[in-house]
Amino acid sequence: MRVCVTFLLVWTLCLGQAFAHNKRVYGYLEEATLLEQHLTLPAKLDTGAKSASLYAKHIRPIDIHGKPYLQFVVPTKAGDVHFTCVYVGDVDIKARSGEIAGTRLKNSFIRRPVVNMSLQLGGDIRTIRVNLANRRRFLYPLLLGRETLVAFDALVDPKQKFTLKHAVNRL
């Protein structure tokens, strides 16, 4: 009986390791491409954040064939890039220091609009939910949280950065 239990335990551990090796290892910083406009941006892969967040300005709702969309601008060093994406709702995000003027941070939330976007990391493409935010004061215009990392079956190595090669225009 002990032999069977030991065998099953070892087999389970080995099987788990085999599945873990199928995951892609990314650095904590990578270049990601928003395929709607073929815009490649530096992105921070953050296992502490739940959702993806993109620096966007001039956000306005529009209606296309009876469906809700958002038009917005992503500022880049080369100029503004305009997007029109399907609006999927809003999300409440816990406020960070300096995000809400004149309020204390304890239990403060910011409501942000969410859109679906096609994102490419390396050779993989997924449609992800992205909340639109003013990320001007952050170093990276795109933050990819756990939901996106799970969608890409990703592992993040905090010792690495910019491990992927892109052939798409970087602005």
Q: Where are the regions a protein language model picked out?
A:
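Bacterial N-terminal signal peptides
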Residues: 5-15
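Pepsin/retropepsin-fold aspartyl endopeptidases
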Residues: 19-171
